[in-house]
Amino acid sequence: MARRRRAEVRPVQPDLVYQDVLVSAMINRIMRDGKKNLASRIFYGACRLVQERTGQEPLKVFKQAYDNVKPRVEVRSRRVGGSTYQVPVEVGPRRQQSLTLRWMISAVDGRPERTAIERLAGEIMDAAQGRGGAIKKKDDVERMAEANRAYAHYRW
């Protein structure tokens, strides 16, 4: 068992442009090596690109993409009687957010566009329309949970 106290969850401050906590969390996920200014430029640049290409409010498109990528169920390994089962469990809201943002960033990293701004904008627009790498990852995870529904009674 852990000897230390459980780390308290610090509230995320909303971003300066949209006053939105989710945008701030996304910027924090984009950030590498503490370069938050660069991460902010990438995100807001992608928002400008989304605005130009779709003609819609970028925050609305981002939220739509977020909701499309958000997983409902996932599988967790559970060892019972010498064998390991992949048990489907519902995903809590904090884990939903972290998985969604993580999948979106990893999908952005795998895209072919030249700049980070173009890659992020492309992934946000694709995810908002129900396609792209992050959506594929979500579908894979939910398909795995559906395939292992027989082990749902092992849930803890």
UniProtKB/Swiss-Prot annotation:
Function of the protein: One of the primary rRNA binding proteins, it binds directly to 16S rRNA where it nucleates assembly of the head domain of the 30S subunit. Is located at the subunit interface close to the decoding center, probably blocks exit of the E-site tRNA.
PANTHER family on file: RIBOSOMAL PROTEIN S7 (PTHR11205)
Species of origin: Deinococcus radiodurans (strain ATCC 13939 / DSM 20539 / JCM 16871 / CCUG 27074 / LMG 4051 / NBRC 15346 / NCIMB 9279 / VKM B-1422 / R1)
GO CC annotations, alphabetized: cytosolic small ribosomal subunit; ribosome
GO biological process, one term: translation
Alphabetical list of InterPro entries matching this protein: Ribosomal_uS7, Ribosomal_uS7_bac/org-type, Ribosomal_uS7_CS, Ribosomal_uS7_dom, Ribosomal_uS7_dom_sf
Gene that this polypeptide is encoded by: rpsG
Assembly information from the UniProt record: Part of the 30S ribosomal subunit. Contacts proteins S9 and S11.
Domain of life: Bacteria
CDD domains assigned to the protein according to its UniProt record, in alphabetical order: uS7_Bacteria (cd14869)
Keywords associated with the record: Ribonucleoprotein, Ribosomal protein, RNA-binding, rRNA-binding, tRNA-binding
Family: Belongs to the universal ribosomal protein uS7 family.
Keyword Protease: no
One term of GO molecular function: mRNA binding
Protein's recorded name: Small ribosomal subunit protein uS7
Keyword rRNA-binding in annotation: yes
Pfam families: Ribosomal_S7
